[in-house]
Amino acid sequence: MISFYEWITTKYRTKSGDFKDNRFGDLARDVYRDRNFPAASTDKEEISGYLRRCGACGPCMETFEAAWKKYAKEN
């Protein structure tokens, strides 16, 4: 199983290397730029806890939940 970090930063990039212009691309860009993000994690609670501790807003958490559902289906 690949990590959530690897999945989202790969799935939501364009062929040119930019992040897609949607809420999932925005989350992927934020995750990519965060040097402290638990990049090796495949654990939903660990990642959501990290996002909450970092002060993620409601829409960000909603996007994470939706992205996690897609990630879980594909992995």
Could you say what each language-model-derived stretch is?
Residues 15, 34, 38, 58, ...:
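Short secondary-structure junctions and interdomain/linker hinges
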Residues 11, 30, 67:
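Short acidic/histidine-centered micro-motifs embedded in hydrophobic/aromatic stretches
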Residues 1, 72-75:
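Short intrinsically disordered terminal tails
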Residues 18-41:
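A short, structured beta-strand/loop element
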